[in-house]
């Protein structure tokens, strides 16, 4: 259900175990900063909800959507963290088959139009990705690729960042780094929505 005045989105379903996403405070005076979890079992409709919000579509049967007052919502699904636009085929091929003599694009060559952005610099520091610009794309770890996906989305200055299954494939150390980065995103004024399966994954 949408309260278009207060920008409160509620997703109530027999399939979705939990879920109320608040993208603004009740006064409607702004979007609260922090991490909002939406939790449900596999197949409960979390990703569908995220896609509806990110694309600005209303599903009148379930009364889902988002307020016109929220102009920029970005969603990242981590089921395939190598899905950078335009380089996914290259990455998958070169990750498995590239030789030392093959030419492979660097991070700087792929994102050259964004490297001078204050947003890029800010979040590169938050995610500890300094000097990653010279690294070849096929040598990036899954964690580095995940962080680049987020920075790439943040360069578009979203009001809300929706992260679907953000902990897939992360070991304990990487997960700790990721949680710390999320805290810093909150401190820097970014609203984050996590789509999760396990209540224990809700960040503290």
Locations of regions flagged by a protein language model:
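Conserved ABC ATPase signature
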Residues: 136-140
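Catalytic Walker B motif of ABC-type/P-loop ATPase nucleotide-binding domains
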Residues: 161-165
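ABC ATPase nucleotide-binding domain signature region
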Residues: 50-114
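A short, proline-enriched helix->beta-strand linker immediately N-terminal to the Walker B motif
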Residues: 155-159
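H-loop/switch region of ABC-family ATPase nucleotide-binding domains
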Residues: 195-197
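Helix N-cap at the start of a conserved alpha-helix in ABC-type nucleotide-binding domains
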Residues: 172-173
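Hydrophobic anchor residue at the start of the ABC signature
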Residues: 150
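Conserved ABC ATPase "signature" region
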Residues: 116-132, 154
């Amino acid at each position: 259900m949408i309260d278009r005045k207060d920008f409160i989105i509620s997703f109530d379903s027999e399939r979705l175990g939990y879920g109320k996403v608040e993208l603004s405070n009740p006064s409607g005076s702004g979007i609260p900063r922090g991490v909002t979890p939406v939790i449900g079992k596999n197949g409960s409709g979390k990703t569908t909800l995220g896609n509806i919000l990110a694309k600005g579509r209303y599903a009148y049967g379930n009364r889902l959507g988002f307020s016109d007052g929220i102009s920029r919502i970005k969603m990242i699904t981590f089921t395939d963290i190598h899905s950078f636009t335009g380089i996914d085929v290259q990455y998958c091929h070169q990750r498995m088959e590239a030789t030392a003599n093959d030419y492979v694009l660097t991070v700087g060559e792929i994102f050259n139009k964004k490297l001078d952005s204050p947003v890029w610099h800010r979040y590169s520091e938050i995610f500890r990705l300094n000097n990653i610009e010279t690294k070849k794309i096929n040598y990036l770890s899954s964690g580095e690729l995940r962080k680049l996906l987020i920075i790439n989305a943040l360069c578009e200055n979203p009001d809300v960042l929706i992260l679907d299954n953000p902990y897939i494939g992360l070991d304990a150390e990487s997960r700790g780094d990721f949680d710390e980065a999320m805290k810093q995103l909150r401190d820097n004024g970014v609203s984050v929505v996590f789509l999760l399966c396990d209540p224990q994954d809700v960040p503290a």
